[in-house]
Amino acid sequence: MGSTFNCHRPLFMINIRDFMAQDHLHCDGFFQQTERLAAAQNWAGAAAAFAQFKTLVLQHFDAEETLLFPAFEEKSGMRMGPTQVMRDEHTQMRQLMDAAGAALDEKDGGDYAGCAETLLIMVQQHNLKEENVLYPMCDQHLFDQAIVLLPQLQELLPGKAT
């Protein structure tokens, strides 16, 4: 369904959807690591992995909210459409990440599990909407700007460059 990120391909040959979907996978890896460590009650390790996950997700949100979404809204004229829905979901996920992080800090496995389950479902649904609806719309509307936007996104998402 989605293609894999190839850092040897020139950046201009990678579309927005593929680039941002690969960043979703990059973030997801840290969430999966958190889950494994929390299940083993390795609270320090889980908290560290979750902190990295949260940092990467917040960088991803920032790249979307400060660069990608405004460019899409300007070009498409849609300001209260899919980008507003995504911003609202970002707000909800920030709250869930705060709650999950607090549960890890308290070493409360039950509370963490509840927060993490809700967060996981929300992240999966959110990513599907972005990857199957919003990012293809961005590729369509921002095609002529992709050669400028993709390097800027890469700069904002440093984990993607490696």
PLM regions with names:
Residues G2-T162:
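Small-residue-biased structural context
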